[in-house]
Amino acid sequence: MLIGEAQLRRIIRSELLRESAKSPEDLPKGTKFIFTRYGDNEIDLDVKSPGNPMMGKLKITKSHEGCEGAWEVSFSNALVRGLGPLMYDAMMEFIYPDGMVSDRYSVSDAARRVWKHYHSNRDDVHHQQLDNLKGELTPDYEEDDCEQHSANKDRADGPNMGNWRQSPLSKMYSKPGDATLGKLYSLGMFVRRRG
């Protein structure tokens, strides 16, 4: 079976993302993952080390619309290559059983690759299709209605381009268990605060 050039590019990008993802053991000694909860509507994750006061930041806010009660990424910035997926894994475990969704209006290319990787390559991360605000998929159920602006403008590859339901950004993701948080805790990297 021959694969096309576009499919080969997707495979290579996926492998590069997988190989570049950091694990807690890859980070400098003294690195801290600081989870700060501000009431019931915002959680910040700041990743710092003694030599780098800001390695990465991930901010999530409780969705104002249905979205199955998911937390929405409102800000994400990883200044260390491969740290983004580790921050997302840690945050999804931290908020479980709640799920997490991408920013509903704007998603960087790097973040889109992470969401696509979760959707296509991570059996340990669950994904659930969300509806749009018109209720096209589940007209009699409003809890899954969610803004799909990012999914609508997503530059999805292949024949499904333009179909918001095919975009990894149209889903809610959750990660049961504590594989990542357990490692952070055992390495003395996990810090929980109230804002």
Give the predicted meaning of each segment.
Residues 69-81:
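Extended, structured, electrostatic nucleic-acid-contact surfaces
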